[in-house]
Amino acid sequence: MQSLSLGQTSISKGLNYLTIMAPGNLWHMRNNFLFGSRCWMTRFSAENIFKSVSFRLFGVKCHNTDSEPLKNEDLLKNLLTMGVDIDMARKRQPGVFHRMITNEQDLKMFLLSKGASKEVIASIISRYPRAITRTPENLSKRWDLWRKIVTSDLEIVNILERSPESFFRSNNNLNLENNIKFLYSVGLTRKCLCRLLTNAPRTFSNSLDLNKQMVEFLQAAGLSLGHNDPADFVRKIIFKNPFILIQSTKRVKANIEFLRSTFNLNSEELLVLICGPGAEILDLSNDYARRSYANIKEKLFSLGCTEEEVQKFVLSYPDVIFLAEKKFNDKIDCLMEENISISQIIENPRVLDSSISTLKSRIKELVNAGCNLSTLNITLLSWSKKRYEAKLKKLSRFA
């Protein structure tokens, strides 16, 4: 009897597996009744091995020969036919490919019936492959619930194209339905819920209790600051900052205190700030907000600004706190290198909305048009492209 020359064969009694190791492949076959509780090594002939064991080869590889084999050949074929990026899908949610039952064809037909193109469907599955695990009944129910917020099927398709996770992350339709009812009950409008669904869909995957906790916290915060209509306060905060319901009450409370203490605001001033431009700061990491403000303060102090000027600058444009320290410093330096004074920046903080490359190119164009940057209203540096180019054309005409 000749020994198996391609590799070695081991019989594992404890795991009930027969493993055949050859140069290019690793095959696993289960034998549930032949072996005991420990394992030993022995030699078999190739003839005996393949006579005694019947098996189905189910490992299929795609593109990358070093990656883990896919388990479901039919699934792989279906997804490839649909134009799905298999490598992307496997990297994002590899567990989906180990399922023996999936609903990719049902998902395809469902989304086609709602107006999605084949390309959009392929993109959705590539980026969020767990979508193919949802049943037709679950999809239909969830879609109907979304239509209580979103006005058309096409609008839902557009949301799914941007963020497939928003629709497919959870299959708990009862929780979704309860959250929708609750958010309507506290006075949020359909427009506000649509904004939540588009920007912060995880709000609807939260447990109902979690959303109730945040709403109750905000109502109490509004009352403590002197707002006489807690429901109106909640509506304003959520509309200004749709991400707030997916943050902890601890974080929001810390940021309210940060704004109060840092800028020495009384209740009325704080109320105006957080119902307006300061609302967006409430969901920031409190440590990040403090570090960012400390950096802004240090940079502006180094350029001769007073404490009052720094506070005026940040309060007039709270979004500046979102800028990373290096990005903020680099933008300030870029503007000052072009003979724009710090007082001009303080008066027109929204110029920091633009990227450094946009600032440099626009400054160059304005100089070429004969503009004196030291006397120019620099707000046009942050205008939309269309509006800026129209203004530049007028300035060039009079140069």
From Swiss-Prot:
Phosphoprotein with mostly four phosphate groups. While the DNA-binding activity is unaffected by the phosphorylation state, only the phosphorylated form of the protein is active for termination activity. Functioning seems to be regulated by phosphorylation. Residues 169-170, 247-251, 324-331, 355-358, 384-391 are annotated as: Interaction with DNA. Keywords: DNA-binding, Mitochondrion, Phosphoprotein, Repeat, Transcription, Transcription regulation, Transcription termination, Transit peptide. GO terms for cellular component: mitochondrial matrix; mitochondrial nucleoid; mitochondrion. Residues 1-57 form a transit peptide. Its main location: mitochondrion. The keyword Disulfide bond does not apply. InterPro entries: MTERF (IPR003690), MTERF_sf (IPR038538). Changing R387A: Strongly reduces affinity for cognate DNA. Strongly reduces transcription termination. GO terms for biological process: DNA geometric change; DNA-templated transcription termination; regulation of DNA-templated transcription; termination of mitochondrial transcription. Contains nine structural repeats of about 35 residues, where each repeat contains three helices. The repeats form a left-handed superhelical assembly with a solenoid structure that wraps itself around DNA. Transcription termination factor. Binds to a 28 bp region within the tRNA(Leu(uur)) gene at a position immediately adjacent to and downstream of the 16S rRNA gene; this region comprises a tridecamer sequence critical for directing accurate termination. Binds DNA along the major grove and promotes DNA bending and partial unwinding. Promotes base flipping. Transcription termination activity appears to be polarized with highest specificity for transcripts initiated on the light strand. This is Transcription termination factor 1, mitochondrial. It comes from Homo sapiens (Human).
